[in-house]
Amino acid sequence: MIILPAIDIIDGQAVRLYQGDYNKKEVVANDIFNIAKEFECLGAEYIHLVDLDGAKSGYCVNEKIILKLAQTVDVPIEVGGGIRNFETIEKLIENGISRVILGTIAMEDEGLLKKAIECYGEKISVGIDCKNGYVYGRGWLAESKLNYLDFAKNMESLGVKSIIVTDISKDGTLEGPNFDMLMKLKKLVNIDITASGGIRDIENIKELKNIDIYGAITGKAIYSGNLSLKEAIDITR
C-alpha cells in the first residue's frame, strides 16, 4: 500500500475542509511548494492534489500552480477538482501530471471518460465521493441518485483501473476511515482502491494495509501532527 499525502488548494493556499464544507476552511500552509518538497523529503511515493476552487467552479482554477508544482518535485502527482473536458486532461498529463482524477465527468459524461481511458489508460482514475451510500459531484455539493457500489462496478466495466473512495462525512474529522464501505468495494471490484477521508493515526494506516488496498490518502492527520508521514510510509513499504 502507498501513502498519498494530500494538498487541497483554495486561493493558492493549502487548506483542509471539514466534511467537505467550504465554509469550514482551515489554512494549513501558505506555500504549497514547500509542503510538496517536505513530502518528497520524507519519502512520499505519490502526492494527492485537489483544486477545491476548481471542483466548485467547474474548471481548473489553479492550473498554473499545479503545473508549476509538477516541475518542482520529483514525485508523481495525481490531480482532481474541476477537470471536466478533454483539453484539460490532455494538458495536465502532457505537462507532467502522472494521474488525473475524474469525478463529476465520470458521472455525467461516459463518452468523455471512455475517450480519456482510451488515450491515457491507467493515468485516469475516478473519484467516488459519497455520503449515505450515494455519490456526490460538483465539489461534493450535488447529490446524485447513484449508489456507490453500482457506480464503482460500472466504472470497472468501462475500463477504469483505479478509484479513489471518499466518505464525505468522514473527511477532515479524524474519526477513522469507513472500513465497511471499503470492504464492500474490495469484494465487489477487482481494481485499485485508494481510501480517503477520516484517517486519524498510524493504527488506521495499519488497518488499511491489512485489508490490502492500493493506497491511503491523508491530509489532516499529517497537518495536525496526529500522524507521522515518514512512519506511515515506512510501515507500508
Swiss-Prot record:
InterPro entries: Aldolase_TIM, His_biosynth, HisA_bact_arch, Isoase_HisA-like, Isoase_HisA-like_bact, RibuloseP-bd_barrel. GO terms for molecular function: 1-(5-phosphoribosyl)-5-[(5-phosphoribosylamino)methylideneamino]imidazole-4-carboxamide isomerase activity. The active site is at residues 8, 129. The lineage of its organism: Bacteria, Bacillati, Bacillota, Clostridia, Eubacteriales. Pathway: Amino-acid biosynthesis; L-histidine biosynthesis; L-histidine from 5-phospho-alpha-D-ribose 1-diphosphate: step 4/9. It comes from Clostridium botulinum (strain Alaska E43 / Type E3). This is 1-(5-phosphoribosyl)-5-[(5-phosphoribosylamino)methylideneamino] imidazole-4-carboxamide isomerase. Belongs to the HisA/HisF family. It is found in: Cytoplasm. One of its GO terms (biological process) is L-tryptophan biosynthetic process. CDD domains: HisA. HAMAP family: HisA. GO terms for cellular component: cytoplasm.
